[in-house]
Amino acid sequence: MNGDISHPRGSGPGNLGSLEETLQQMNTLIKENRDLKEALKQTNLSMKERFEGLSAWKEKQKEERDFLEQRLEEARTRLNTMDVENEALKNQVKELEKSGAECLHTELEALRGQILRIQAEKNDLVAMNSELQLKMGQGSPSNSFIEIRIADDDLKVTKDLSSVPEASAFSMPKAESEEQTVRQLLRSLRAETDEKERLQLTLQEARGRIAELESKLEHADSSAQTSLPSAAETNASTEVKNLEDQLLKLCNELKQAQIKLDEAESMKRNLQDRCKDLEQDLGTLKTQLGDKQKVQAENDCLKVQMESLQAAIKLEQKKTQDEKNNLNQLKDAYTKLFEDYSELQEEKKKRESCVSKDDYDELQTRFATAEKALADKQQKIDEMKMELFQKEKDLETISVFQAQAEIYSSDFYAERAAREKIHEEKERLATQLEYVKKQNSQLQEEMESLGRHSMSEMQRRHVPRGANPQGPTAPNNLPGGRGEWQQQNIPDHACPKCGEVLPDLDSLQIHIMDCII
């Protein structure tokens, strides 16, 4: 009897070994599940960090594109203003050329008339002087010849001056014709000064001759008084009167010549002032022409810069579009992985109480596929990083960006503010992540407490049935055939140690864990 009763207990170590293996498998499954959860968590965090990095890089590229567009707009406005200023300067130059040519033409005609008038007066003075010299018998033909020759030279000079502007006005450009007219005016000023000096010399000579004539008259008077008779005295007196009249006339002519000299000096001063004004106008025109050339060169440079900026902006837009497409693909992959992760979490929550080998294999295959997908995405991300690195190198090699390196240094403070903003956003996301972690840990604790509560409820539900564990073995005095029949009719959900019959497999597993402990 005792041997038959102890026989079912003797078969306990084999069942105990299978139970330990089951517990070990369950522990390994739980551990692998935790590892899988941790790996998914880490991949989620890494994907989130990479997504944040890509978002920050996208914001930076957007700021740079906005800055380049702003610079392009400024360059366009500056080009428009420069074009307007260029047109205004062209109109001013045309007006100045037109007014300057008209003024120079009128002044040239006036100077020609004055030179001809002065020349005629000089010829009259020379003729009068020669006539006086012939009358007095003291004339110097060499001097008169020199004066006439000088007058002829003046005529030639005036003719040259009148012919040169006409030839230059038609042959030379406007700027060169203005310079030529200034030079001609300077030559005319020099001729006027020479003429003034000659007139002063002629005045001095005339005064000297008048003094000689007066001395000769006095000598003639004295000689006439001593040697000649009364008739000769009368002739001498008449001759003296004639000479005095001639002297008075000559003095008047000298006064008129002095007045003309004063007029010539005033005209000379006016011409000098006009020459100074023309030189100043010429200098201003030259400076305006230089400024115009500089503005034109700056316009050309700005056009070249604008074309290069437009090409760079087009290239940057194309790159940003490609990066946007890649980012959208990454977002789709991330959402898909997140959905897979959420499905795995839900399935884990559903099957956490009873994990079978098939489920474990399925989880393992899904985990392998998830790891493979993550590896593929990581490879794609690395390739994108390499492409981004290459694109950054290409961007650095652009000459326009190198030329604007100094401008970028002025944007340091704006970039620092953007970085501070990004740092604040990261801190905010970190706080949100901590909050999510806390919620996750709370949910896990609630799940564990719920599992323990359900396990305790199941234990409490099944303990009253096993309150009399010796019930099936109570009839110890039964014959051996009856014991063997009972051993053969043991139900499937009976405890191998104590023989307690349980309604289902879950209750049996919980009871076995409690009974073994």
Curated annotation (Swiss-Prot):
Write down the PANTHER family for this protein, in alphabetical order. NF-KAPPA-B ESSENTIAL MODULATOR, OPTINEURIN
- Residues reported in the UniProt entry to bind Zn(2+): C495, C498, H511, C515
| Listed name of the protein | Optineurin
Its keywords, alphabetically, are: Coiled coil, Cytoplasm, Cytoplasmic vesicle, Endosome, Golgi apparatus, Metal-binding, Zinc, Zinc-finger
* Role played: Probably part of the TNF-alpha signaling pathway that can shift the equilibrium toward induction of cell death. May act by regulating membrane trafficking and cellular morphogenesis.
- Region annotation (Disordered) ranges: 216-237, 454-488
- Top-level lineage group: Eukaryota
Q: Which GO terms describe its cellular component?
A: autophagosome; cytoplasm; Golgi apparatus; nucleus; perinuclear region of cytoplasm; recycling endosome
Q: Which chain positions lie within coiled-coil regions?
A: 15-127, 174-453
The scientific name of the source species is Danio rerio
Positions of CCHC NOA-type zinc fingers: 487-517
Q: Which Pfam family is one of those matched by this entry?
A: CC2-LZ
